[in-house]
């Protein structure tokens, strides 16, 4: 596996490899912030399976962190990440520093930032964007830069960050980016907990409790799938189905609900009801919940999850 730290190295590699194969080969790309786990591995394995070359980037992107968020404490596990990537037969790791990606610097205060940035208006302000107002501006900007550097045929993203995928799909479509996006299913443990780099902050007991996030979403999905033809469930009925599962953990202060959403898959517009008809468009039930660690009550971890129907 080749490890590159500059744009010039990636461009030179890409030009040389494709020239030798007369541009008949494909490049798959998996952008990450490191601290890789089995969820990332599933994306990478899919790329290796489907493409001639696979490029993975590891870059902890400052522009998607707010001044109140602790960029310095984001987990960085590069030596372990490299071992995993080598075992997965990745061709190139691109691991730039912040100066490479943001030549004018990247202060966390948006008012002090200079240079070009990408905003996807209308989608970025919803759900995650309410809690993290400039998060998707940072994501869209860094992904645009990475797409321009790698020039991959296809890029792989996990369903767990579904709003990110929807925002980036809009960006790719409307900025005419020549990279296809592919969303891969959420990787879960045996009891349904979505794998996340944040899980490592929780003790085993709190991780076990967190498995109820998926139980709540799954209960809502089952209620929808049981609808008879022409049947209808209101928004409140669906969301109540979710929160009833979580109620004991809210009462015990293990969970603090940020949001539960019932939305159109493409627009993320909130739905008033769901009807079992052929005209019903795909929907996404998503959530964000703050989980307080039982061993270290000062540790609060925000977990997200979703189900697409």
Swiss-Prot record:
Highest taxon above the source species: Eukaryota
Pfam families listed in its UniProt record: Pantoate_ligase
Location in or out of the cell: Cytoplasm; Nucleus
Biological processes annotated in GO: pantothenate biosynthetic process
Keyword S-adenosyl-L-methionine tagged: no
Alphabetically ordered keywords of this record: ATP-binding, Cytoplasm, Ligase, Nucleotide-binding, Nucleus, Pantothenate biosynthesis
Cross-referenced SUPFAM superfamilies: Nucleotidylyl transferase
Pathway membership: Cofactor biosynthesis; (R)-pantothenate biosynthesis; (R)-pantothenate from (R)-pantoate and beta-alanine: step 1/1
Enzyme Commission number: 6.3.2.1
Catalytic activity: (R)-pantoate + beta-alanine + ATP = (R)-pantothenate + AMP + diphosphate + H(+)
InterPro entries tied to this protein: Pantoate_ligase, Pantoate_ligase_C, Rossmann-like_a/b/a_fold
Signal peptide (UniProt feature, chain positions): none
Disulfide bonds: none
Gene Ontology molecular function: ATP binding; pantoate-beta-alanine ligase activity
Top EC class, one word: ligase
Entry's Gene Ontology cellular component terms: cytoplasm; nucleus
HAMAP family attached to this UniProt entry: PanC
More about this protein: Present with 2400 molecules/cell in log phase SD medium.
Protein function: Required for pantothenic acid biosynthesis.
UniProt family annotation: Belongs to the pantothenate synthetase family.
Record protein name field: Pantoate--beta-alanine ligase
Organism: Saccharomyces cerevisiae (strain ATCC 204508 / S288c)
Record gene name: PAN6
């Amino acid at each position: 596996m080749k490890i590159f730290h500059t744009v010039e190295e990636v461009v030179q590699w890409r030009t040389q490899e494709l020239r030798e194969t007369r541009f008949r080969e494909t490049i798959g790309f998996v952008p990450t912030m490191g601290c890789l786990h089995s969820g990332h591995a599933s994306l990478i394995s899919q790329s290796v399976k489907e493409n001639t070359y696979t490029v993975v980037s590891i870059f902890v992107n400052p522009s998607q962190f707010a001044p109140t968020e602790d960029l310095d404490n984001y987990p960085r596990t590069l030596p372990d990440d490299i071992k995993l990537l080598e075992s997965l037969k990745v061709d190139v790791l691109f691991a730039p520093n912040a100066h490479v990606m943001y030549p004018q610097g990247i202060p966390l205060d948006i008012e002090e930032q200079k240079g070009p940035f990408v905003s996807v208006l209308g989608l970025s302000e919803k759900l995650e964007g309410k809690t993290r107002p400039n998060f998707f501006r940072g994501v869209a900007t860094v992904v645009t830069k990475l797409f321009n550097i790698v020039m991959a045929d296809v890029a792989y993203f996990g369903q767990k960050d579904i709003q990110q995928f929807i925002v980036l799909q809009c960006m790719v479509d409307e900025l005419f980016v020549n990279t296809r996006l592919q969303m891969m299913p959420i990787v879960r443990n045996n009891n349904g907990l979505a794998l996340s780099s944040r899980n490592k902050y929780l003790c085993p007991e709190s991780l076990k409790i967190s498995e109820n996030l998926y139980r709540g979403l799954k209960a809502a999905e089952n209620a929808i799938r049981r609808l008879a033809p022409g049947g209808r469930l209101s928004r409140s009925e669906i969301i109540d189905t979710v929160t009833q599962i979580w109620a004991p953990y809210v009462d015990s202060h293990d969970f603090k609900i940020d949001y539960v959403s019932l939305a159109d898959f493409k627009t993320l517009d909130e739905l008033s009801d769901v009807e079992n008809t052929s005209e019903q468009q795909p929907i996404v039930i998503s959530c964000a919940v703050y989980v307080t660690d039982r061993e270290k009550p000062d540790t609060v971890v925000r977990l997200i999850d979703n189900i697409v129907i």
